[in-house]
């Protein structure tokens, strides 16, 4: 079964209302592959012109089946529910911001010199303008107890740190939505999506499925104002942080560093205010107001919750209405016969309808074929191969894949090699197993092969060799021509003597009577005639003599014939054969005659030597009679 991929493409546009998306606007089917799955593709496009708090799409199996050449076996539902949207506001501390503290008045006298008073202000007093020199007043007075002038100082010291201020950064959108996909009654595939999972170009896992985003999933609500508030950190605050009024902090900062607090030191020094009046009623009023929590009339951020309570990474989260603005996105769902969405398509069914065998010569290759018909209802991709062959046969080409339409046939061809494995039979019969596999079914059969072994000898021919005891043994070629079989071992005083035509016999011989190691027939042109082999066999000598005689006779005719032909070509005239009174032989060249004689002898001897002596005698008599009558 060909696999397919189901692509669900949703195009959702931002709007103002919050209607639930429930249907698809168009369904198209494209044959091909998707980015994540092999196979065909469903594209289901949905367009919604509003932000929404829910997507609930239902597609029936019949609706999907209409768009493909197969059958979809389950309904499909896609839901985006349980949306939760927030804004995250991070905090940033800065050297531009000063801690909010309460102050206490500080007075000391008895300094001997002016410089002693200045040094005491630098070391012991709170630095109002943060320039590193301290802030305070000093004056000279006459000491009654000692008749000298001493110095006194008036300043503030830090009493308690109320809070550390920090800027509130612009918000990051944080939202989640639970996505669920289910085909029929199969296990639900789900994922919880957030803005980190739904950015432009991001691919999100939805169980075994995928969601590819073509834009950013955004909040469907406005952001609360953050420019009129400031974050305040203190261990005394619940969860460490609170939202303060930025203007109250600026008023405190201006009062402390802008000169108002220093003016109170002057008023205290000249007696306008007492120390307790300055400390309890005047200098700490702005500090206490600066650390108060902002009101809801200033910003909706007062309803934000602390997300991170640490000083360095503090942050707030603000819940927004549960609306999301969806971009276009695509859901990829594995489909096919074994996919999450089951799609059944007509498939091919292979059936082997014929095979052809082959004969293979030893060391060569032959070709076997098998014809396969697709008896299924759909196109099939069939993989044909030779899986195994019998002993002595080896597979050269083992696999081939072909696409076959319904009702069509295709032929597979494979080369098979053969090498000799037996000395018992000239022909080796065997078989190879041919298999063809489709997606859902397969077929197999045996294809016969025959190996033809090369002949090692001519049946009936003999050869001889000495054994380990230095005695002659005679071997005879078997009827199948594949091997020599042991015949006989000659006696110690015998030798294996050639008898002609590759035959041998054990004969008693003198030490110098031949019978060497030659494994052939020992029937040379003159050795057989004059006993060079020491055989003394009369029949062999007669056979050789008649062969020579035949060669001489043929040489005679070759000599005369060659001179006659040469003489004929030398005659002048209109029609040469009319000059019967001219001797062509005498006119011909002797050199041509010699050449003809040699050729005639070789041909005559060669032809005669292959016949039995009886046949040779009959032929010689026939030639003699012919010479007598036609000379």
From Swiss-Prot:
Further facts: This entry represents a metagenomic sequence isolated from an uncultured archaeon from a hypersaline environment.
Protein name per UniProt: Fusexin 1
One GO cellular component term noted in the UniProt record for this chain: plasma membrane
Record region (Fusion loop, required for fusogenic activity, not required for membrane surface localization): 143-148
Chain sites annotated for binding Ca(2+): 112, 146, 149-150
The encoding gene: fsx1
Stretches for region Domain II N-terminus: 91-170
UniProt region (Domain III), positions on chain: 349-455
């Amino acid at each position: 079964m060909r696999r397919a991929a189901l692509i669900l493409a949703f195009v959702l546009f931002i709007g103002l209302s919050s209607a639930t998306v429930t249907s698809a606007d168009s369904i198209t089917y494209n044959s091909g592959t998707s980015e994540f799955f092999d196979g065909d593709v469903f594209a289901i496009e949905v367009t919604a012109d509003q932000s929404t708090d829910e997507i609930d799409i239902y597609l029936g199996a019949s609706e999907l089946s209409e768009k493909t050449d197969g059958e979809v076996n389950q309904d499909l539902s896609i839901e985006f529910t349980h949306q939760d949207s927030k804004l995250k506001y991070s905090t940033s501390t800065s050297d531009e911001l000063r801690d909010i503290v309460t102050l206490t008045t500080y007075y000391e006298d008895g300094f001997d010199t002016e410089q002693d008073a200045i040094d005491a202000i630098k070391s012991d007093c709170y630095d109002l303008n943060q320039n590193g020199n301290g802030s305070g007043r000093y004056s000279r007075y006459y000491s009654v107890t000692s008749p000298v002038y001493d110095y006194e100082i008036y300043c503030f010291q830090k009493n308690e740190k109320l809070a550390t201020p920090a800027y509130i950064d612009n918000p990051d959108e944080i939202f989640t939505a639970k996505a669920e996909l289910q085909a029929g009654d199969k296990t639900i595939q789900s994922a919880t999506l957030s803005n980190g999972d739904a950015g432009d170009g991001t691919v999100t896992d939805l169980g075994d499925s995928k969601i590819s985003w073509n834009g950013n999933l955004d909040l469907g609500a406005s952001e609360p104002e953050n420019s009129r508030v400031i974050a305040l950190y203190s261990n005394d605050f619940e969860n460490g942080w609170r939202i303060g009024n930025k203007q109250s902090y600026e008023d405190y900062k201006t009062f402390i560093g802008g000169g108002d607090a220093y003016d109170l030191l002057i008023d205290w020094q000249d007696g306008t205010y007492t120390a307790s009046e300055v400390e309890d009623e005047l200098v700490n009023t702005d500090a206490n107001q600066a650390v108060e929590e902002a009101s809801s009339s200033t910003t909706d951020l007062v309803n934000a919750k602390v997300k991170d309570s640490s000083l360095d990474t503090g942050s707030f989260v603000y819940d927004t209405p549960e609306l999301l603005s969806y971009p276009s996105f695509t859901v990829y769902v594995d489909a096919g016969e074994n996919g999450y969405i089951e799609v059944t398509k007509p498939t091919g069914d292979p059936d082997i309808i014929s095979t052809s065998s082959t004969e293979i010569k030893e060391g060569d290759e032959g070709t076997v074929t098998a014809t396969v018909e697709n008896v299924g209802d759909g196109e099939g991709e069939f993989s044909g191969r030779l899986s195994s062959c019998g002993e002595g046969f080896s597979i050269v080409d083992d696999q081939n894949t072909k696409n076959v339409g319904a009702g069509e046939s295709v032929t597979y061809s494979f080369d098979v090699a053969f090498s000799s494995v037996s000395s018992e039979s000239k022909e080796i019969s065997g078989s190879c197993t041919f298999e063809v596999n489709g997606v859902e079914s397969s077929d197999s059969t045996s294809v016969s092969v025959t190996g033809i072994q090369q002949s090692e000898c001519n049946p009936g021919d003999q050869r001889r060799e000495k054994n380990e005891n230095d005695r002659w043994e005679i071997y005879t070629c078997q009827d199948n021509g594949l091997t020599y079989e042991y015949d006989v071992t000659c006696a110690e005083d015998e030798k294996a003597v050639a008898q002609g035509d590759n035959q041998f016999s054990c004969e008693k011989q003198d030490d110098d009577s031949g019978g060497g190691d030659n494994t052939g027939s020992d029937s040379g042109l003159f050795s057989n005639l004059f006993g060079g082999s020491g055989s003394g066999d009369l029949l062999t000598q007669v056979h050789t003599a008649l062969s020579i005689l035949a060669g001489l006779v043929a040489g005679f005719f070759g000599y005369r014939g060659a001179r006659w032909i040469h003489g004929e070509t030398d005659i002048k005239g209109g029609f040469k054969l009319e000059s019967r009174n001219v001797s062509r032989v005498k006119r011909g060249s002797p050199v041509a005659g010699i050449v003809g004689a040699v050729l005639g002898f070789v041909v005559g001897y060669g032809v005669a030597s292959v016949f039995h002596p009886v046949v040779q005698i009959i032929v010689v008599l026939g030639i003699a009679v012919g010479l007598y009558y036609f000379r």
